[in-house]
């Protein structure tokens, strides 16, 4: 038996408890557009015409987001080179600094999302985070500007005389990185939802606006990556670190000004509470009722709490037989409901929809965990490819030298070229073979990306072995290799294909398999994947650096690439990738895709079931 509401908001006859519609004042809280109920009236038309939000507001948000990314990514695009050349850190230490900071940066959005959803709202969170990002950029710029805040330059005649940073210098550097992490924690989880808030999705124009906003958002993000990894990196490498850092800092200051310039145009949606508390409530309620016995099949002897769901939710989830222990959280027992209908204690009674949402999360976690190692391959290539490039011929013509930090543009170009081909050619071709609307399933797309990550590591190991042999044979005392840097292109192209399949596949998978109410968790899980991959990469680097060497031989990740065995490290990541692929295949084989019905269809279906059940009982 299920307790629920009719479409008109009244309770079903003969059921205990009533679930009334929200009052107009309550609707005003969720509806930022404050529309009145009489459609077509002059007053209503005036309100719609003068409402805030829309593309005028979004232009300020996109401008802020573009300039913020130009600032933060522009500063850090070449950071591996900055740490090794200016702060004189060994490549292992520099890689660990970047990996640990990147992991922390990808954890902070979880905190930012919780604070935004529960307490202060998205505007205030982004505003505070923008100032934190600006402080971080200013701090990092100061480390390049003042001699007291970075180690003295090396003697060109004696490279081994380079001294490392002192406690003050490394402390100021880490302080700047912490500010940047705080900024990312507020901006990343809130910028997209705040942009979506500006559109009224109850209208066709609003739905189209949201779709267009996503296109513009990701297009500007790609453009920013290309600009930062070419123009900004070139200025940092060939002109000056001070100018190369000052430009991103100035752009971030402009981003803050632009964000506040749109204050009068924004739609402000009040925080409704975090989904994390809802997850905890389901788990606690199920534990409190753990001694309840559920029948093997739904025979009508158990009453489940299933009220009308929020208007923001577009589909109703079926009660599934998987993880049935959680169903106890939705079982109604004596004292669970107030006389008015709602639960007396949300930590003892949850709705069927809330329980099914938690089940979706549990089903997705194994798939999510399989993505960490493939992302670790990306992290590894992003750090050590720069070290390889610094020892290779980067000349493009007689006068231009390619910055080592700009090589990742090859992966970006691969993504930009391949995605239209994937959408226009690959998907229609595979659709004719498989009959699937997307050509291949989302899990097949993610698995293909994992395969490309493995091949990328294998190719990277082969190229590094060739580079080391040529460098040793050349006998250059500086370790330079008479080998074009474009030999690194194959591994970068393969990694670009990995991103096109794996990362975009994960984003689509999380957003399609999570209920609408839990989309914030989908984005948080993706950031958490990068955090896990960063910490895993840092752990592997530390362990290999410590244990791969001996008394008479250098370790694999020696600061002298020719003395080390970086190719062995790449092969190690490839082997872990193969193990991860087997684990992913095992998890994907047993995964059941989310099944839901539109609200109208579900309620009509439930009404039919109720009539049928009532008639059967009357016949008895």
Swiss-Prot record:
Cysteine pairs bridged by disulfides in the record: none
UniProt xrefs under SUPFAM superfamilies: MFS general substrate transporter
Low complexity compositional bias, start-end: 10-25
Protein name stated in the entry: Protein NRT1/ PTR FAMILY 2.13
Disruption phenotype: No visible phenotype when grown under normal conditions. Growth retardation when starved of nitrogen.
Subcellular localization(s) per the UniProt record: Cell membrane
Chain residue ranges for the region called Disordered: 1-32
Post-translational modification: Ubiquitinated by NLA. Ubiquitination of NPF2.13 leads to its degradation by the proteasome.
Keyword Transmembrane listed: yes
Coiled-coil ranges (or none): none
Tissue specificity remark: Expressed in leaves and flowers. Detected in stems and siliques. Highest expression in the distal lamina of older leaves. Restricted to the sieve element and companion cell complex of the minor vein.
Entry's induction text: Circadian-regulation. Expression increase during the light phase and decrease during the dark phase.
Assembly notes: Interacts with NLA.
Organism: Arabidopsis thaliana (Mouse-ear cress)
Source species, domain of life: Eukaryota
Role played: Low-affinity proton-dependent nitrate transporter. Not involved in dipeptides transport, but has a weak glucosinolate transport activity. Involved in phloem loading and nitrate remobilization from the older leaves to other tissues.
Family, similarity comment: Belongs to the major facilitator superfamily. Proton-dependent oligopeptide transporter (POT/PTR) (TC 2.A.17) family.
Record PANTHER family: OLIGOPEPTIDE TRANSPORTER-RELATED
Membrane-spanning intervals of the chain: 70-90, 95-115, 126-146, 167-187, 213-233, 241-261, 364-384, 402-422, 443-463, 485-505, 524-544, 568-588
GO MF, one example: low-affinity nitrate transmembrane transporter activity
GO biological process: nitrate assimilation; nitrate transmembrane transport
Membrane topology: Multi-pass membrane protein
Alphabetic keyword roster: Cell membrane, Membrane, Nitrate assimilation, Symport, Transmembrane, Transmembrane helix, Transport, Ubl conjugation
One Pfam family named in its UniProt record: PTR2
């Amino acid at each position: 038996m299920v307790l629920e509401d009719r479409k008109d908001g009244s309770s079903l006859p003969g059921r205990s408890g009533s679930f009334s519609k929200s009052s107009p004042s309550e609707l005003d809280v969720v509806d930022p557009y404050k529309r009145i109920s009489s459609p077509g009236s002059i007053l209503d038309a005036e309100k719609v015409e003068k409402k805030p939000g829309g593309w005028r507001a979004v232009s300020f948000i996109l401008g802020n987001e573009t300039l913020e990314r130009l600032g933060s990514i522009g500063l850090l695009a070449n950071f591996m080179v900055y740490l090794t050349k200016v702060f004189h850190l060994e490549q292992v230490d520099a890689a660990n600094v970047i990996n640990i900071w990147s992991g922390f940066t990808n954890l902070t959005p979880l905190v930012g999302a919780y604070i935004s959803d529960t307490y202060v709202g998205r505007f205030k969170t982004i505003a505070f985070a923008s100032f934190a990002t600006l402080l971080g950029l200013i701090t990092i710029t100061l480390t390049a500007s003042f001699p007291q805040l970075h180690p003295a330059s090396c003697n060109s005649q004696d490279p081994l005389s380079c001294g490392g940073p002192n406690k003050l210098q490394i402390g100021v550097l880490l302080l700047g990185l912490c500010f940047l992490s705080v900024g990312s924690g507020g901006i990343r989880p809130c910028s997209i939802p705040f942009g979506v808030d500006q559109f009224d999705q109850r209208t066709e124009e609003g739905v189209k606006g949201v779709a267009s906003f996503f296109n513009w958002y990701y297009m500007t993000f790609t453009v920013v990556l290309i600009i930062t990894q070419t123009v900004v990196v070139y200025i940092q490498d060939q002109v000056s670190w001070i100018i190369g850092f000052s430009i991103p800092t100035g752009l971030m200051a402009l981003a803050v000004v632009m964000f506040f310039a749109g204050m009068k145009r924004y739609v402000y949606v009040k925080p409704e509470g975090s989904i994390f508390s809802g997850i905890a409530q389901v788990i606690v309620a199920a534990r409190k009722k753990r001694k309840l016995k559920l029948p093997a099949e739904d025979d009508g002897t158990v009453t489940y709490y299933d009220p009308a769901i929020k208007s923001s939710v577009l589909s109703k989830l079926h009660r599934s037989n998987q993880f049935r222990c959680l169903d106890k959280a939705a079982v109604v027992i004596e004292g669970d409901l107030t006389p008015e209908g709602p639960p007396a204690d949300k930590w003892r009674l949850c709705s069927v929809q809330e329980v099914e949402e938690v089940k979706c999360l549990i089903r997705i976690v194994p798939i999510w965990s399989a993505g960490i190692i493939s992302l670790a391959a990306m992290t590894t290539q992003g750090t050590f490819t720069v070290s390889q490039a610094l020892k290779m011929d980067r000349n493009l013509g007689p006068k231009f030298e390619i910055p080592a930090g700009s090589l990742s543009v090859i992966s970006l170009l691969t993504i930009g070229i391949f995605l239209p081909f994937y959408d226009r050619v690959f998907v229609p071709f595979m659709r004719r073979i498989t009959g699937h609307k997307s050509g291949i399933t989302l899990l097949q797309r993610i698995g293909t990306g994992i395969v490309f990550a493995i091949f990328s590591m294998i190719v990277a190991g082969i190229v590094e072995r060739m580079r080391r042999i040529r460098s040793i044979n050349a006998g250059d005392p500086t370790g330079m290799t008479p080998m074009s840097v474009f030999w690194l292109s194959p591994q970068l192209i393969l990694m670009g294909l990995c991103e096109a399949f794996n990362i975009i596949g994960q984003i689509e998978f999380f957003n399609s398999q999570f209920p609408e109410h839990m989309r914030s968790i989908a984005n948080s899980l993706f950031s958490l994947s990068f955090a896990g991959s960063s910490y895993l990469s840092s752990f592997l680097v530390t362990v290999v650096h410590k244990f791969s060497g001996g008394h008479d031989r250098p370790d694999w990740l020696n600061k002298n690439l020719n003395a080390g065995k970086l190719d062995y490290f790449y092969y190690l990541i490839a082997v872990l990738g193969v193990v991860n692929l087997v684990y992913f295949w095992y998890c994907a084989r047993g995964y059941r895709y989310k099944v839901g019905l539109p609200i109208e269809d579900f309620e009509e279906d439930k009404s039919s079931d109720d009539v049928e059940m009532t008639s059967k009982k009357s016949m008895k």
